[in-house]
Amino acid sequence: EVVSLLGGNGAGKTTLLSVISGTNRPYYGKIEVFGKRLQKYRGKELYIRKLASLPQNPQTVFLKMTVREDYEELAKVLGCKKSELEDKIQAVAQQLEITHLLDRHPYDLSGGEQQRAAIGKVLLLEPRLLLLDEPTKGIDAWSKRQLGNLLKDLRGQGITLLMVTHDVEFAAEVSDRCGLFFDHEITSVDTPEEFFCNNNYYTTAANRISRQQYENAITCEEVIELCRQNGRKSIR
């Protein structure tokens, strides 16, 4: 499933991801990933075929002169055989439609292209859980739509996605559940429809504008479809 956490600046959303990924340690309490205490994982055990994390700035995951070199370096670290290396890279690149970007310098890519290339790199880890920190930051509407379709595809492949974001429209489009992070606590978790329709502040523009006519519409597409069904050309 895709789970989105929303909340104000300083609420602790990014800190939560860093604790789950093992980057930071909690001051108190415990973290379990796949039923195992985080402290019990040794070396790279947590990050191979279990958990991967994509930071807010996708540029930070790239270390080499081309996207391909970055992918090759990571695949080798993971123990990928030389005979399987190119097939593995091509499989990821084709899935994300970035084959034409493999020989480009990561910093020469657009924001949306960098985001997809960065996701490609973490997918080489074959994660069951993918953490995403503000994945739509700095990308245009078209790239955002492509990213949304990609996240839905990954969900269909059995990958769980935990995303923190300020982008309520994107969360409404792609999430199975949404939660509110307030004062370092998750105060509510519900379906996108229940979460946004019962919230006056953290809700979508579509819901805010249309809620007097359509109680459960949270995306522009839903409002447009309801208007068509009811023969209304506009909402007053």
Each model region followed by its residue ranges:
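Helix-to-loop junction immediately C-terminal to a conserved catalytic motif
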Residues: S21
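Conserved beta-strand-loop-alpha-helix hinge in the C-terminal portion
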Residues: E185-I209
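Conserved ABC ATPase "signature" region
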Residues: E72, S83-L101
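H-loop/switch region of ABC-family ATPase nucleotide-binding domains
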Residues: T165-H166
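Conserved ABC ATPase signature
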Residues: H105-L109, E113
